[in-house]
């Protein structure tokens, strides 16, 4: 209630004197990362703001400030005044998962990887209209394109969409279509592997096949590979297209 403005459907910062600030930033997504919003409020923010192409769902989504806000600034220096931050992409995975918005995650992952490109520009922020990575450097210094959260974001999106991710006492498997690949996670003496043909996937625990799945699914299992639930990454995905 302290940050949420029900008339506008988002959270807003307050200054040191507790006065609400009117600028529409991405910070409601941060609250979703911490799972601190009631589900109806999160759903309203996603529907009204996050997925609005006039605000946050730009060609390169997740600008720090809504692009139609008077205080939005598309500047290349890293100051959170407008451009899409790699750190926000990293946080967005958990934020969207907390509230079941799984189908937004593949779009974000692919947009980020396209922006990073074959030149591997792991920078702090990206132009929300073009995806251009501004490579900033101080005079006499090499370009700063080795930003840790950008690298970690790519690793995590890859694991969520095409691989397997240990999440506490569960595993999250991704069978996104479009690329044939093999992904293995090894922890201590255990291995979890998913082999994706580009239109379906097979999952293995310690070399033992535990299920096959159709394309564009997000499958949650226990650590032994027993299926707990299935969700869709794609609009046409079939959660029943899983065989043990």
What spans do the regions from the language model cover?
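Glycine-rich, flexible loop/turn motifs
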Residues: 7, 20, 58
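Active-site-adjacent bridging/hinge elements
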Residues: 4-9, 61-71, 130-133
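Alpha-helical solenoid scaffolds that mediate protein-protein interactions
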Residues: 1-2, 112
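Generic long, charged, amphipathic alpha-helical segments
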Residues: 58-85
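Short, surface-exposed linear patches
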Residues: 53-57, 72-73, 225-226
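C-terminal capping/lid segments that line or modulate ligand- or cofactor-binding pockets
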Residues: 10-49, 53, 78-193, 198-203
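C-terminal beta-sandwich/jelly-roll accessory domains of carbohydrate-active enzymes
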Residues: 197-244
